[in-house]
Structure formats: C-alpha cells, structure tokens
Amino acid sequence: MKDCEYQQISPGAAPPPASPGVHRPGPAAPPGPSPGPAPGAPRWSVSGSGSGSGSGSGSLGRRPRRKWEVFPGRNRFYCGGRLMLAGHGGVFALTLLLILSTTILFFIFDCPYLARTLTLAIPIIAAILFFFVMSCLLQTSFTDPGILPRATICEAAALEKQIDNTGSSTYRPPPRTREVMINGQMVKLKYCFTCKMFRPPRTSHCSVCDNCVERFDHHCPWVGNCVGRRNYRFFYAFILSLSFLTAFIFACVVTHLTLLSQGSNFLSALNKTPAGVLELVICFFSIWSILGLSGFHTYLVASNLTTNEDIKGSWSSKRGGEASVNPYSHKSIITNCCAVLCGPLPPSLIDRRGFVQSDTVLPSPIRSDEPACGAKPDASMVGGHP
C-alpha cells in the first residue's frame, strides 16, 4: 500500500472530475466560481506518493531533542545537560548539609574569638580549605565519570552475528568473553548484556546508574555519582582535603573550648558556644571514616589499583587463587601517582548536548532476503498483505 501525501487545496480550485460511467445525483450547481470552504475549515486531498516526504513537514514545528533527554541510564541532568548526577540525590544532599552546617557554625561561633585571641590566619586557612573541598565535591558529583555509550542496534546486531560465527556447531552457546594481552598479563573482557558490547579493560557496569563506566572504581552515594576515570582525581582530592578540614575544625573547636574554660569550668564554656558541641560530635564521628578512606585510596593510587579490583582480588590472592602481577602498575609509586592523578583528562564520550539524529537508511547493496539495519520489514514478511 502506497504512502499518502496530504496537500491543501486552494479555495478556488475546481472539484476533481467524475469517473466515466458514474452518475452523481443532485441538482446542478449554478455557473460561476465555486464558493470554497468556510474560514477555518480547509479542504484536503489525498494523492498517492511512494516517497516519505510528508514526514518531514510534520516535524517542522517540533523542537529538536538533545541526547541527554533520551539518555538510557538512570542519571539526572541539569542546566540543559551540562551537569549530571545519579538517580538518587538524598545522600548527596546530606553530604552538602553536613559540610555547610559545620563550616558555617565554625565561622559564626569560633572564628571571631580565635582570630582575636590567636591569629587571623585561622579563618583564612578554614576558608581556603572550605572552598577547595566544595570545588572538588561539585566536580566529582557533576562530572561524567567515564560513561561508555551503548552499542547501537546495528553495532549490537553485527557483534551478535560475529559471536554466533565464532561458536561451535554444538548446542552450547558461544562464549561471551574475550582475552587480550596487557603488559604480558592475560586480561579477560566480559560481555555486557545491557550495553551490548565487550567491556574494555577495567570497565564495569554500575547497577545503580545502569551505565558502563571506564576504569570503574565504585559508586559513591555520598557524592551522588560513580567514581571512574574522568572524576577519580577530583574524588581523591575531595576526601583528602575534607579530612584536613575536619581535623582543622575539630582542633580549633577544642582550642576554643579550652581557652574559654581557663577562667571557669568546662560547662560554662559550653554555654558560651552552644554550637561547639554539635561541631565536635560531627567532626569526631566523621574524621575517623574520612581519614581511613583517604589512607585506603592513597594506597590504591600508589599501587594504580581501583576499589573494584581490590575488592574482587583481581591481582592478589584474596580469593584463594595465585597472586598475579598488576599489569597497570608502573613499578614506581611516584609514576603511579602521576599516572592516576596528573594524566590528561579524556573527553566525555556520551555527547550530552548533541542533538538526536533521525534514523536514516543509507542506500547500500543488500540481499533481498535480509533487510537493511534500521529499515522496516515489508508487510508480506510480517504476515500482512502485499
């Protein structure tokens, strides 16, 4: 069945001629031009056409969509796709609340007294640490961690065909793994059934964000994002600077309470600075976890490992197997630190701000029994009438 193209008839156009042998009853129309349709009620005619030119006219008034609007993962985008965050943001909001509230209370109740009594450098150091911590946190949270775009329909079909061709003639399904050699070490590449591709080395699929992330370290709900190749340096700088800020505020609050309690008891000092108790509680319970996390990631950076690799024991004997050499290590702590923290930042691969292109099929010589990728099958192939 041919496609139909609708064209508007001008009001002064004559009606189409009647087919031969067909009698049209009714009174004859008076001579003269036809009155035409009423205002607001245009007439339409249907003309057969084999081309799909009518589909372009219907999309003239439609706003072109950007790629972040149809992104298949569970991320949320802000500012027109310029910023991205994980699907859940409650824990990230709690992180912001704890940092902001503790620092604001410190600047209101402790900094004025310490600046007058000791030195003006205390509020300056606290302000520098605070702005550096917030900058690293926002960069970690709103930066693309290294998401790999999913395979298109054509790419997935070609890869499936390639996998089927490599399988044996038995009923056993073909293997979904590949092996590559990296610095003399055999590394196994696994197939991602969600993204329809073989994951590159050190890439893993995050079950929370539903994305394959390059050099996947872990998913951190405290920063509201995955930690991967493109934002790991910001994450490491964030936890390291946050440990310094927490320890600095804790030491300053203790010093403030000690100076106030010299002329009186400790309870009267607490009455003068009621926010000091809240600051001490938050800093005391935060500093141990933050310092431990900073030390653990310092070990990972020096060894050029990821949290995912360390937990799985990929290059150690944690799971009872033989310990193997880490193929990504440069055999030097300084070189590993420079490679992880100071290397060039790769560009984002998902093109969040790009426009969604319409699915067009390029003319190519194909077999008559195999439709082109992206083309609709003929009606006779799906049980319809030709």
Curated annotation (Swiss-Prot):
The reactions it catalyses are: L-cysteinyl-[protein] + hexadecanoyl-CoA = S-hexadecanoyl-L-cysteinyl-[protein] + CoA
GO terms for CC? Answer: endoplasmic reticulum; Golgi apparatus; Golgi membrane
- UniProt-listed GO biological process terms: innate immune response; negative regulation of cGAS/STING signaling pathway; negative regulation of innate immune response; peptidyl-L-cysteine S-palmitoylation; protein localization; protein targeting to membrane
Q: Which GO terms describe its molecular function?
A: palmitoyltransferase activity; protein-cysteine S-palmitoyltransferase activity
Q: Which residues form the DHHC domain?
A: 190-240
What does the UniProt function comment say about this protein?
A: Palmitoyltransferase that catalyzes the addition of palmitate onto various protein substrates, such as CGAS, HRAS and LCK. Acts as a negative regulator of the cGAS-STING pathway be mediating palmitoylation and inactivation of CGAS. May also have a palmitoyltransferase activity toward the beta-2 adrenergic receptor/ADRB2 and therefore regulate G protein-coupled receptor signaling.
Give the Cytoplasmic membrane side ranges.
1-88, 139-233, 297-386
Stretches assigned to the Lumenal side: 110-117, 255-275
Its chief place of residence is Golgi
Lipid bilayer topology: Multi-pass membrane protein
Q: What is its EC number?
A: 2.3.1.225
Comment on protein domains: The DHHC domain is required for palmitoyltransferase activity.
Q: What is this protein called?
A: Palmitoyltransferase ZDHHC18
User: Can you say where in the cell this protein is located?
Assistant: Golgi apparatus membrane
Q: Where is this region: Disordered?
A: 1-65, 362-386
> Short name of one Pfam family for this protein?
DHHC
Q: Which family does the similarity line name?
A: Belongs to the DHHC palmitoyltransferase family. ERF2/ZDHHC9 subfamily.
Tell me the organism: Rattus norvegicus
Bias (Gly residues): 49-59
Give the modified residues of type Phosphoserine: 19
Which residue windows does the record flag with biased composition (Pro residues)? Answer: 27-40
> Which key words tag this protein in UniProt?
Acyltransferase, Golgi apparatus, Immunity, Innate immunity, Lipoprotein, Membrane, Palmitate, Phosphoprotein, Transferase, Transmembrane, Transmembrane helix
The cross-references to PANTHER family, in alphabetical order and at most eight, read:
PALMITOYLTRANSFERASE ZDHHC18, ZINC FINGER DHHC DOMAIN CONTAINING PROTEIN
Q: What PROSITE patterns does this protein map onto?
A: DHHC
Q: Which residues cross the membrane?
A: 89-109, 118-138, 234-254, 276-296
